[in-house]
């Protein structure tokens, strides 16, 4: 092309880079947001609008963020941004969970001995460590672009939060729902503390299982003293604590002769037990019911001087074992209930570290100080020596573990604080019935977990946490009432929780209870009680944030955790659910579906990712996933996301470049051609669908709609054919301004739909827009109303034109293969429409839309190839190519350019 004509083309221009450079640009954009306080500005702008409150579940303040944190916070961030741009005041108050064992452990790893360090000094170290972790994580969330003010947050260690939590404890106590009792609970020797059900996870382990024969010493009319009762257990270490044997009231039992010994076991299990123990032959001597065995006494299998009874057990079945249950009241919930029913105190000679105490010395001195797991071997050898061991076998089975230390836990009878749920259970379940959930099955799951939940163990034997406010006399008898509790909590509100650990008990007691040598409780509240109080603490701190909140969104591991604790606490506190809607998301896994772990080397550090590839790419990945299921992420998936990002970015760059001379205040056109109206109709359809998907929190639908729109509606259609108009037409021609008007609306549509996702890129787009009266940030704007929906008749016609376009393109492809033409603009196209599509013939600009030289309609279909809605023929246009627009014409001015181009050139 001659330079003179090249220079007359209106080639687009923009400062918006083709290369993203997100790792460098994003921090700069974030600094601008911080400097101009964009989040605070938006909250101010939205004052008076309806409140939308998403309550942020607090991540634990220990260590750097992982990919699961990024997924969770990005999902929340997209919700908040969408709501703020669509008529709501939607604050994002982030929270942190800051008490508990992991922080204590982190401090002790710094060389601090918890037991040798003064309590307040140790607690201050924990606080300092936790606050550093909060600051670190807050900065990392900022790098991911979270729309919040990190100065306005909630942290469970702050004074106001701790006092709010204690007021909740007080309210529960006043409702007579808090009690202290000796009960078997989950105990973690590795963390030396009680655990709640929500802190338990199950893992497969190999354990010894044993069949034990216990000799009858006091029989009855049916059972002689030469008979032996057979029990089976997976915890041999509990045999020293055996207090009873339990039989089922409606279970049938046999007396069986095998190897010249007589054994009692459930009839239905005889064959199975015989096979497991290795009885080659056996004989059924008698049959009897469970109650006929009750009252029989047997010698303890290890300590023959200890005589124990046979009793009825409500929990006994004949589905496994022997149908007779070894009962140790100190190490099992059902066992505890049974021994208490018979007036016997549970025997639990295991200390906080899982070692046998001196209580066992009366029977077996060698066990004192032995770790419970190590006792399995000792017990097995002793049973074998006494000929009480019938069979030992190792089996794999699911066993409870401490969710923090990942080590096994035991059931252990200790004195703990509990919240009794009986009074509130019906209201809790009624509240669950009222919420909506995503996925739908989530409601049933939460309901089941709460329905099955037993009383909540809320005490922990640690230092770093909120103290349980209670007192004891010199005989360790509990001294507590409403007056004492109210006074003590008021005093803590004045002095802070640290005071509880270093000031005398009298400081916290009403005058009438002082000088009585009372002692303070040493236990602290469960961290789930902390985080489960967060909705209440927030509603008390911000009076304009009443319960219930609109939304809770966390991982699907929180049904037994935060979802659960929050529902219990809020119901007891206010009678209400803390949330109207609950959403759970899956876990992040690698591309093969494997859980991410350091050992597999398949983890993805979100901050490292943001600093190399950009937070916007990570956010686009989040939007692309069905988050209700586990989300896969890895190199191939990220590559696909990167390709989608480039399509989106290049499309917006093209639009920006071709709006360089468009001033919407002067050049915006309302009288548009049919194809422009069709493009705007499609824009509105997609935006409406995507907006509905946003409202339904279905971000993968938004992602698919936008990527499909960019690829098909824009790149493959509208943006393709308008290049001729944009580049060739006179700069201020009506037709060019019409097309630019459509581009302007298309850009705003992409801005609105991508603003919650590609937060940095859309800011960059906005700042690159010209001839616009701009505000500080795109994130201060509300979504633009874009209602361009056309009639069904109009849309049907244009949908058919798109089908005709496909028909023409197929014919052009055949013509290219047959060497009739090289390019579409060389083609003369003849179309014979099928009868029901004749209304297309009146449409103008079709040759431009189809990017051909000319297009004509005929009623003579002969010689044309049949396609979907038309018969199409293609011929080569004979003529000369215009040096400016490349169109083929019969004649050119000066043998160089066409009349249209000449008129444009002459006007320059």
From Swiss-Prot:
Keywords attached to this entry: Aminoacyl-tRNA synthetase, ATP-binding, Cytoplasm, Ligase, Metal-binding, Nucleotide-binding, Protein biosynthesis, Zinc
Binding annotation for ATP: 598
GO molecular function, one term: tRNA binding
Gene3D superfamilies: 1.10.730.20, HUPs, Ile-tRNA synthetase CP2 domain-like
Pfam families referenced in this protein's UniProt entry, alphabetically: Anticodon_1, tRNA-synt_1
Motif annotated as 'HIGH' region, chain positions: 59-69
Domain of life: Bacteria
Domains (record comment): IleRS has two distinct active sites: one for aminoacylation and one for editing. The misactivated valine is translocated from the active site to the editing site, which sterically excludes the correctly activated isoleucine. The single editing site contains two valyl binding pockets, one specific for each substrate (Val-AMP or Val-tRNA(Ile)).
Complex formation: Monomer.
Family under the similarity heading: Belongs to the class-I aminoacyl-tRNA synthetase family. IleS type 1 subfamily.
Protein name: Isoleucine--tRNA ligase
Native organism: Mesoplasma florum (strain ATCC 33453 / NBRC 100688 / NCTC 11704 / L1) (Acholeplasma florum)
Gene that specifies this protein: ileS
């Amino acid at each position: 092309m001659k330079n003179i004509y090249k220079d007359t083309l209106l080639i687009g221009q923009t400062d918006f880079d083709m290369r993203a450079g997100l790792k460098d640009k994003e921090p700069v954009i974030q600094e601008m947001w911080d400097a101009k306080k964009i989040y605070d500005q938006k909250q101010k702008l939205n004052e008076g609008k309806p409140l939308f409150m998403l309550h942020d579940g607090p991540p634990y303040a220990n260590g750097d963020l992982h990919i699961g944190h990024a997924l969770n916070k990005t999902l929340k961030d997209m919700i908040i941004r969408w709501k703020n741009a669509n008529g709501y005041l939607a604050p994002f108050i982030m929270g942190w969970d800051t008490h508990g064992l992991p922080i204590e452990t982190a401090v002790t790893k710094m060389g601090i001995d918890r037991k040798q360090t003064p309590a307040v000094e140790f607690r201050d170290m924990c606080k300092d460590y936790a606050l550093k972790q909060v600051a670190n994580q807050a900065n990392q969330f900022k790098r991911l672009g979270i729309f919040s003010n990190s100065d306005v947050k909630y942290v469970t260690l702050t004074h106001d939060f701790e006092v709010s939590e204690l007021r909740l404890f007080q309210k529960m106590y006043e409702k007579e729902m808090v009690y202290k009792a000796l009960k078997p609970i989950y105990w973690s020797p590795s963390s030396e503390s009680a655990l709640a059900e929500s802190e338990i996870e199950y893992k497969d382990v190999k354990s010894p299982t044993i069949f034990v024969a216990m000799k009858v010493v006091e029989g009855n009319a049916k059972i002689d003293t030469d008979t032996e009762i057979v029990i089976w257990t997976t915890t041999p270490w509990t045999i020293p604590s055996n207090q009873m044997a339990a039989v089922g009231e409606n279970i049938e039992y046999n007396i069986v002769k095998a190897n010249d010994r007589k054994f009692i076991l459930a009839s239905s299990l005889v064959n199975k037990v015989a096979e497991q123990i290795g009885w080659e032959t056996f004989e059924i001597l008698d049959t009897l019911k469970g109650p006929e065995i009750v009252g029989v006494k047997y010698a303890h299998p290890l300590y023959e001087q200890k005589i124990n009874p046979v009793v009825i057990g409500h929990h006994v079945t004949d589905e496994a074992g022997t149908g007779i249950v070894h009962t140790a009241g100190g190490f099992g919930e059902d066992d505890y209930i049974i021994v208490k029913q018979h007036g016997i105190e549970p025997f639990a000679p295991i200390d906080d570290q899982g070692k046998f105490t001196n209580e066992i010395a009366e029977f077996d001195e060698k066990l004192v100080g032995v770790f419970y797991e190590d006792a399995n071997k000792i017990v097995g050898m002793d049973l074998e020596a006494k000929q009480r061991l019938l069979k030992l076998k190792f089996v794999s089975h699911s066993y409870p573990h401490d969710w923090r230390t990942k080590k096994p836990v035991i059931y252990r009878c200790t004195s703990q604080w509990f919240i009794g749920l009986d009074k509130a259970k019906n209201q809790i379940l009624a509240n669950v019935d009222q919420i909506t959930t995503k996925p739908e099955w989530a409601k049933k799951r939460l309901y089941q977990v709460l329905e099955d939940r037993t009383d909540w163990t809320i005490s922990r034997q640690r230092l770093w946490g909120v103290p349980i406010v209670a007192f004891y006399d010199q005989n360790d008898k509990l001294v507590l009432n409403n007056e004492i509790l109210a006074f003590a909590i008021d005093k803590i509100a004045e002095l802070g929780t640290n005071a509880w650990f270093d000031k005398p008990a009298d400081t916290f007691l009403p005058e009438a209870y002082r000088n009585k040598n009372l002692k303070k409780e040493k236990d602290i509240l469960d961290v789930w009680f902390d985080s489960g109080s967060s909705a209440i603490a927030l509603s008390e701190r911000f009076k304009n944030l009443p319960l219930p909140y609109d939304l809770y969104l966390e991982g699907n591991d929180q049904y037994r955790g935060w979802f659960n604790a929050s529902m219990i606490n809020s119901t007891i506190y206010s009678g209400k659910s803390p949330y109207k809607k609950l959403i759970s998301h899956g876990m992040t896994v690698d591309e093969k579906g494997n859980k991410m772990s350091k050992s597999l080397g398949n983890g993805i550090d979100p901050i490292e990712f943001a600093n190399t590839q950009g937070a916007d790419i990570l956010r686009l990945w989040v939007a692309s996933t069905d988050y209700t299921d586990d989300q896969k992420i890895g190199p191939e998936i990220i590559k696909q996301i990167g390709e989608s990002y480039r399509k989106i970015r290049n499309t917006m760059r093209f639009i920006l470049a071709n709006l360089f001379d468009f001033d919407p205040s002067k050049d915006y056109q309302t009288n548009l051609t049919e194809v422009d109206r069709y493009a705007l109709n499609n824009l509105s359809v997609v935006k409406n669908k995507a907006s509905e998907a946003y409202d339904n929190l279905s971000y993968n639908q938004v992602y698919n709609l936008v990527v499909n729109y960019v690829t098909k509606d824009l790149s493959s259609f509208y943006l393709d054919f308008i290049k001729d108009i944009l580049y060739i037409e006179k700069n201020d021609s009506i037709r060019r301004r019409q097309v630019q008007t459509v581009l302007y609306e298309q850009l705003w549509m992409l801005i609105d739909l991508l603003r919650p996702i590609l937060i940095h890129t859309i800011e960059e787009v906005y700042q690159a827009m010209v001839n616009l009266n701009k505000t500080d940030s795109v994130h201060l704007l509300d979504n633009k109303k874009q209602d361009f929906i056309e009639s069904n008749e109009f849309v049907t016609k244009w949908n058919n034109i798109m089908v005709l376009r496909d028909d023409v393109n197929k014919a052009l492809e055949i013509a290219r293969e047959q060497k009739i033409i090289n390019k579409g603009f060389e083609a003369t196209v003849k179309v014979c429409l099928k009868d029901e599509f004749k209304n297309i013939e009146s449409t103008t600009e079709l040759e431009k839309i189809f990017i051909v030289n000319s297009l004509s309609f005929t009623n003579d279909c002969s010689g044309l190839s049949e396609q979907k809605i038309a018969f199409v023929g293609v011929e080569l246009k004979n003529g000369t190519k215009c040096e400016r627009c490349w169109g083929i014409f019969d004649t050119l001015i000066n043998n160089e350019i066409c009349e249209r181009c000449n008129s444009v050139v002459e006007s320059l």
